[in-house]
């Protein structure tokens, strides 16, 4: 064994061994308990970042630990390979998305191997291959036949100059990112999957997810947004149709003073025929981004349509306004406004001088003060005719019942959740397998024509999708008749909604899933990824599992038993102000810093001499240039050091602050472990441990070893507090470093301890542990070694510490056998000089003894 720890030599050697032995390849084995550990698959952007490294290290630690428990562990990896960035990169680099993507996959695969992750590479998949997306296309056609897929027009961001649809992130300040033209809202036909048909089940089954974070479940509950309310119909004077609105607060209905409709509503369109101001407003609304988040923060605007609706209960006429905060695609495209008791309605009414009528009393029973804001709390009604004096629930029911009896109201359950629009007007995605015949009939692509393959050898102009630009690509024949293919592609959330299931049978050619394999491995035991995926991906992931269950492919209701959302990785961020006042962000690697005595940064500059402004720790990002390249760190310190720091610096679900000093600390610790094993093995063979012949000191050290095993097992397995597990191993290492190594049993005990330490560290730092296990002559490869088991007998204390007090004041602490009687403890206490001094010449009037803990002698 060499004296120095050289990760650059051992890590590549160990990785080659894993590859050659196919150590982490697994198959179904009914005789073993399975464990499926999955980290969210990466987008092949070109290089791994620290967020990836953290996610995948957590997964690998759990997978390796479960493997050492003797389970059949599946840990696969693949590539979420379709998506918009590839199109941008292709245009920029004058290539096609496919070669750019495949080059990135090859590069990032090497980076993953360099970090020592124990993946079953035989199951690797890339979602952009026809072998993968063919089954998604087939499944989509089956959903269509079941009535779960439909087409309708829906609003998109449209660039009139490029004649193309833009994703929300391609709209910057209301303009096209490419040509700076003002973006419009445009209605175009798109494909939808009926996720709303599963809304109740998606909501109710959240209660089954005991091991998902409450934050994620709450976000999904709110996103699904089930509400109980009343749908109310209003007559409108001089208008051919009625207006229907939905409210969850019928108790406030007597305070409704106006209605608001979307700019695209037929009533607004009709009113605009003779109203130039309204027509201009409708035009302006066309330029509103379709993202819901934008809607929440933008300025609320409106124009009076001139139409008057009739309040069904009071008979009063109330104005109908067109407003930019009402969307046609949400609900009926019309809302009722109660400005006294809804803040948005209040702000709009205040801005345009509309009537504000209070109908709910304040908590103290007084009339509410509406001079500054609306009263949004529930309460007792007033100013509401026959409903005065009713509380929220009674008023809800009374008003709902009255509207129903009049034929103008109906109780309804509503959902905030909308059906999933899966059409994207992009090129780099899976083609949607639908065709249109010459007579206008729309139908699924026949099975014998699947997959509909996306051509990869294309030229990107950055404007139009190559399959839309090439009229020949769309032409096909179905049942002998000419037909046109759909040129939209799937939302890339489609691919990431079922990949976890395909990992169980990636080579299966008879269908989407081999049910036998899928049902052996599924559900996933632990799924690891960022909380930013809480609603979109994690909801579609759950939805797809239910769709596959109902298609008879899987027999479970939910895709993953446990969800672990890892925290973000933060790093120092610095900038200097350029000549034009712009911020130039400087990498923390290039910042020369001065710190105060507490280690805080007080001054910084870069190599060019710019004075840097330090903005604190923030999420590693390209925009702030504060990402740290994992590859550089691995080359400098080794993969094991980077992995150990990642797991030690912070609890897995909290933010992690990147500190190179911490990385250096992790590296020093591994050097200490190496040194201790080196010194131990240099002394030659070791005798067998004889636990009955150990001295008290040896027993105490062995007790520490086994208590550490018990703690680390609990920390990794049950609590998943990996940082405290590492801290416990470090503490034990400090004790081992000080332990005597001269006697035969000293060395035998050290051998037992080091074999345990190396196995406990193995999930975190597998390369060094693989090597040290061999040097310690552990049986077989450590990858197949069992997790150490704490010896209950070794952990039993044979002595205990008793605090001795005289008149309630501590005078000594004594060590006594655990089975010592009160008499023996008193006798032993009396031998202590400090105790004897206070007992001299006095009478012990009372003895308070708490066995094994406290002896209090009351004297006088």
Swiss-Prot record:
One of its GO terms (cellular component) is cytosol. A motif ('HIGH' region) lies at residues 42-52. InterPro entries: aa-tRNA-synth_I_CS (IPR001412), aa-tRNA-synth_Ia (IPR002300), Leu-tRNA-ligase (IPR002302), Leu_tRNA-synth_edit (IPR025709), M/V/L/I-tRNA-synth_anticd-bd (IPR013155), Methionyl/Leucyl_tRNA_Synth (IPR015413), Rossmann-like_a/b/a_fold (IPR014729), tRNAsynth_Ia_anticodon-bd (IPR009080). Keywords: Aminoacyl-tRNA synthetase, ATP-binding, Cytoplasm, Ligase, Nucleotide-binding, Protein biosynthesis. ATP binds at residue 622. Its EC number is 6.1.1.4. GO terms for molecular function: aminoacyl-tRNA deacylase activity; ATP binding; leucine-tRNA ligase activity. It is an enzyme of class 6 (ligase). GO terms for biological process: leucyl-tRNA aminoacylation. Coiled coil: none annotated. The keyword Aminoacyl-tRNA synthetase applies. It catalyses: tRNA(Leu) + L-leucine + ATP = L-leucyl-tRNA(Leu) + AMP + diphosphate. Its main location: cytoplasm. It comes from the Bacteria. Pfam families: Anticodon_1, tRNA-synt_1, tRNA-synt_1_2, tRNA-synt_1g. PANTHER family: LEUCINE--TRNA LIGASE, MITOCHONDRIAL (PTHR43740:SF2), LEUCYL-TRNA SYNTHETASE (PTHR43740). This is Leucine--tRNA ligase. The lineage of its organism: Bacteria, Pseudomonadati, Pseudomonadota, Gammaproteobacteria, Enterobacterales. The gene is leuS.
């Amino acid at each position: 064994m060499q004296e120095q720890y050289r990760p650059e030599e051992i890590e590549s050697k160990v990785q080659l061994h894993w590859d050659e032995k196919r150590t982490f390849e697994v198959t179904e084995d009914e005789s073993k308990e399975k464990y499926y550990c999955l980290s969210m698959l990466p987008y092949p952007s070109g290089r791994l970042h620290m967020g990836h490294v953290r996610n995948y290290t957590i997964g690998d630690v759990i997978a390796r630990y479960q493997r050492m428990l003797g389970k059949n562990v599946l840990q696969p990896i693949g590539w979420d390979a379709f998506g918009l960035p590839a199109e941008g990169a292709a245009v920029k680099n004058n290539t096609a998305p496919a070669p750019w993507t495949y080059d990135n996959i090859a590069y990032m695969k090497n980076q993953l191997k360099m970090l020592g992750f124990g993946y079953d590479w035989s199951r690797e998949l890339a979602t952009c291959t026809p072998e993968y997306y063919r089954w998604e296309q087939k499944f989509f056609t089956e959903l269509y036949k079941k009535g779960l897929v439909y087409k309708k027009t829906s609003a998109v961001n449209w660039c009139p100059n490029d004649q193309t649809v833009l994703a929300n992130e391609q709209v910057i300040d209301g303009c096209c990112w490419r040509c700076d033209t003002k973006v419009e809202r445009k209605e175009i036909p798109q494909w939808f999957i009926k996720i709303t048909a599963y809304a109740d089940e998606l909501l109710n089954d959240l209660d089954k997810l005991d091991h998902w974070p409450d934050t994620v479940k709450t976000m999904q509950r709110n996103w699904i947004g089930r509400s109980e309310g009343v749908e109310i119909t209003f007559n409108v004077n001089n208008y051919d149709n009625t207006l229907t609105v939905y409210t969850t607060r019928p108790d406030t209905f007597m305070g409704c003073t106006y209605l608001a409709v979307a700019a695209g509503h037929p009533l607004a369109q009709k009113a605009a025929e003779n109203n130039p101001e309204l027509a201009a407003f409708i035009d302006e609304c066309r330029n509103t981004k379709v993202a819901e988040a934008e809607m929440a923060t933008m300025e609320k605007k409106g124009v009076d349509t001139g139409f008057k609706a009739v309040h069904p209960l009071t008979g009063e006429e109330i104005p109908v306004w067109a407003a930019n905060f009402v969307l046609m695609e949400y609900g009926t495209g019309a809302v009722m406004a109660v400005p006294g008791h809804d803040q948005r309605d209040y702000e709009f009414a205040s801005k345009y001088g509309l009537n504000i009528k209070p109908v709910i009393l304040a908590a103290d029973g007084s009339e509410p003060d509406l001079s500054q804001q609306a009263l949004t709390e529930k309460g007792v009604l007033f100013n509401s005719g026959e409903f005065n004096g009713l509380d929220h629930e009674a008023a809800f029911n009374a008003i709902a019942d009255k509207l129903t009896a009049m034929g103008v109201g109906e109780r309804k359950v509503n959902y905030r959740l909308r059906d999933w629009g899966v059409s994207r007007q992009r090129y780099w995605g899976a083609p949607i397998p639908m065709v249109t015949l010459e007579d206008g009939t729309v139908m699924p692509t026949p099975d014998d024509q699947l997959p509909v393959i996306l051509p990869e050898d294309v030229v990107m102009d950055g404007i139009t999708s190559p399959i839309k630009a090439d009229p020949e690509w769309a032409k096909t024949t179905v049942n002998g008749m000419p037909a046109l293919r759909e040129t939209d592609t799937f939302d890339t959330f489609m691919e990431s909604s079922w990949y976890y299931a395909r990992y169980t049978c990636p080579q299966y050619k008879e269908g989407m899933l081999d049910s036998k394999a899928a049902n052996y491995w599924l559900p996933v035991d632990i799924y690891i990824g960022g909380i930013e995926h809480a609603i979109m991906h994690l909801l579609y992931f759950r939805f797809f599992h239910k769709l596959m269950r109902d298609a008879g492919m899987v027999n479970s209701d939910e895709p993953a038993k446990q969800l672990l959302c890892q925290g973000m990785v933060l790093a120092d961020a610095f900038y200097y102000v350029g000549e034009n006042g712009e911020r130039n962000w400087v990498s923390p690697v290039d910042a020369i810093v001065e710190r105060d005595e507490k280690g805080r940064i007080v001054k910084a500059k870069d190599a060019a001499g710019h004075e840097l402004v330090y903005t604190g720790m923030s999420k590693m990002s390209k925009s702030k240039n504060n990402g740290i390249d994992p590859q550089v760190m691995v080359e400098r310190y080794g993969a094991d050091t980077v992995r150990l720091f990642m797991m030690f610096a912070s609890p897995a679900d909290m933010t992690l602050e990147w500190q190179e000093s911490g990385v250096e600390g992790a590296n020093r610790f591994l050097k200490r472990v190496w040194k201790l094993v080196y010194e131990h093995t240099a002394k030659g063979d070791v005798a067998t441990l004889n636990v009955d012949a150990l001295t008290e000191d040896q027993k105490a050290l062995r007790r520490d070893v086994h208590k550490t095993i018990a703690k680390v097992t609990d920390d990794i397995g049950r609590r998943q507090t990996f940082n405290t597990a590492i801290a416990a191993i470090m503490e034990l290492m400090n004790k081992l470093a000080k332990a005597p190594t001269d006697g035969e049993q000293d060395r035998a005990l050290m051998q037992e301890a080091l074999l345990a330490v190396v196995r406990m560290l193995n999930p975190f730092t597998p390369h060094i542990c693989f090597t040290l296990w061999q040097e310690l002559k552990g049986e077989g490869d450590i990858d197949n070694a069992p997790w150490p088991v704490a010896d209950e007998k070794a952990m039993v204390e044979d002595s205990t510490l008793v605090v001795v007090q005289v008149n309630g004041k501590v005078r000594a602490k004594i060590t006594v056998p655990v089975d010592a009687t009160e008499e023996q403890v008193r006798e032993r206490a009396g031998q202590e000089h400090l105790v004897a001094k206070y007992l001299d010449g006095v009478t012990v009037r009372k003895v308070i003894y708490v066995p094994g803990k406290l002896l209090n002698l009351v004297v006088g």
